[in-house]
Amino acid sequence: HKDTSQIYSERGWFDLDDKKGDFIGNAQYLEGNTIAKADTITYDGGLDLVTLKSDTIRSEYYSEKDTAFAKTIFYDKKNDVFRLTTDAYYKGEKNEVTGEKIYFDKKTEKFNVTGRSVVSDAPMLIEADTLDYDKSIKFGIANGHVIWRDTAAKTAIYADHVVYKGEENYMKATNDVGRPMFTTDIEGDTLYLKADTLKSFRIIKERIIYPDKNAARRAKKN
């Protein structure tokens, strides 16, 4: 039955009235296509909450659409919210994230990642020490050794801080020390651009003047 949950462990307790329990020692939770593994699983059926905790290994959570690893995994099924703590990894249908801590609201598609993090949201690939990213409105704030790549446009930004507003086609990069750098690939060659503040990279790229090779050859002949 699709609504039936099964939990296995070496020891633990479960209150049938409150639908709450702790399952300790090689605990496993099974429900349909969902599998969870941890040292300890805490289950609250009334609130539809599952918490996985492990000391030496990472807890594991698998479903049709989600894969999550971390020492502690908190999943609020009712609100579709994941909180992953310590050595965290999450992969969904379109996103892949690593970091020390990950908060992900599936309904609003908001990420908050702390610790050195990598977020893949094609064609965007973002690395930073901390990152807030709202996919639904294409808004992101990244801080600390930021590398923000657009794999489709073959561009990259290296900065201490980046603010991104995708719907406005706006991006601002700044540094605490030194200057941020923008790179773009042009016919196999890489263009490097540094400035105190970099803004609106797509506009900058469109204004790049490509050399007219034929005109240069004609000038040499004359």
Regions found by a protein language model. Name each.
Residues 1-222:
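Mature-chain termini and adjacent capping regions
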